[in-house]
């Protein structure tokens, strides 16, 4: 019975090897291919199969996804025992010179003879579908972020600019009935003061929406201008450190960094009850990192956010638009540390 089962298993495995759409390759320790099924011939030719050329797999490989990059040859899976114990994504060049993504395994199946089995399953359609879904997801997040921004602008216009304009309108109407010249001059001066304040409010709102210096000069200049204005308006000191100098980044990245830092500072202003805020911007290798730290009230991350909660939500949404992440470390009475990390 055992012998019959063994024969049947051998037959099934052979049929699977011959008819599977999965590409199956057997190679020795030197990378020389000693056998492969028909499916694998989309990538490896008969010459690769029967020649004595070592590392034929390496010749067709365009890198695999690891901690270093999406397509990297560092810590090659042909040599790394850690990688060989897992499934991984690899990019192989087909015979018509197209680079395709595959889910792969590379396993030692005969230790005595040093024979490895290399299997490949094409995941092009799955990745394409994932990218479409990701684009749709990011589009929804973009629209959501835009709507939240519009709501914020609408609130600020209603609470400050429109209220002040209504005040000016009322006072101008009353001037028509003012017969006391001295009182008339006082009212006119008051209106002049309100209008000047309105101009400042609108100018500040314009800077918050999109500072010209961000487009023209980059993050460093935009932050220095914003921090100076912030200190003048609120009396809170900003301690700023940076190593980016005048380095320019992608426009979307600069916008996200500026907005997240701005939102973190405004949250500290509203809730932290502090006299100073530390802001750091640094480029470390292939990452841009921004930190906003205060030693204020802090909060319980598990509790419902104060206010609308759109600030923290918006920071995460913005970061995701450029494949970044926001980490918030805080405790009640121990301050808050907001860290933005963006790959560049």
Curated annotation (Swiss-Prot):
Q: How is the cofactor bound?
A: Binds 1 [4Fe-4S] cluster.
In this record, what's one Pfam family?
Answer: HATPase_c
Keyword check for Transferase, yes or no.
yes
Lineage top rank: taxon: Bacteria
Q: EC number(s)?
A: 2.7.13.3
Which pairs are disulfide-linked? none
Q: Which positions carry Phosphohistidine? A: 158
Annotated GO MF terms? 4 iron, 4 sulfur cluster binding; ATP binding; iron ion binding; phosphorelay sensor kinase activity; protein dimerization activity
Q: Where does [4Fe-4S] cluster bind?
A: 58, 61, 73, 76
Regarding how it is modified after translation, the entry says: Autophosphorylated.
Give the catalysed reaction(s), semicolon-separated: ATP + protein L-histidine = ADP + protein N-phospho-L-histidine
Going by the UniProt record, its keywords in alphabetical order are: 4Fe-4S, ATP-binding, Cytoplasm, Iron, Iron-sulfur, Kinase, Metal-binding, Nucleotide-binding, Phosphoprotein, Transferase, Two-component regulatory system
Q: Report domain Histidine kinase positions.
A: 152-344
Task: Please name the PROSITE patterns in this protein's record.
Answer: HIS_KIN
Described purpose of this protein according to its UniProt entry:
Member of the two-component regulatory system NreB/NreC involved in the control of dissimilatory nitrate/nitrite reduction in response to oxygen. NreB functions as a direct oxygen sensor histidine kinase which is autophosphorylated, in the absence of oxygen, probably at the conserved histidine residue, and transfers its phosphate group probably to a conserved aspartate residue of NreC. NreB/NreC activates the expression of the nitrate (narGHJI) and nitrite (nir) reductase operons, as well as the putative nitrate transporter gene narT.
Question: GO cellular component annotations, sorted alphabetically?
Answer: cytoplasm; membrane
Q: What coarse category fits the chief subcellular location reported for this protein?
A: cytoplasm
Query: InterPro entries this protein is in?
Result: HATPase_C_sf (IPR036890), His_kinase_dom (IPR005467), Sensor_HK_TwoCompSys (IPR050482), Sig_transdc_His_kin-like_C (IPR004358), Sig_transdc_His_kin_sub3_dim/P (IPR011712), Sig_transdc_His_kinase_NreB (IPR017203)
Q: What is this protein called?
A: Oxygen sensor histidine kinase NreB
Note the Gene3D superfamilies from the entry: 1.20.5.1930, Histidine kinase-like ATPase, C-terminal domain
Compartments, as annotated in UniProt: Cytoplasm
- Which coenzyme or cofactor does it need? [4Fe-4S] cluster
The answer on whether this UniProt entry bears the keyword Lipid metabolism reads: no
Which species is this record about?
Staphylococcus aureus (strain Mu3 / ATCC 700698)
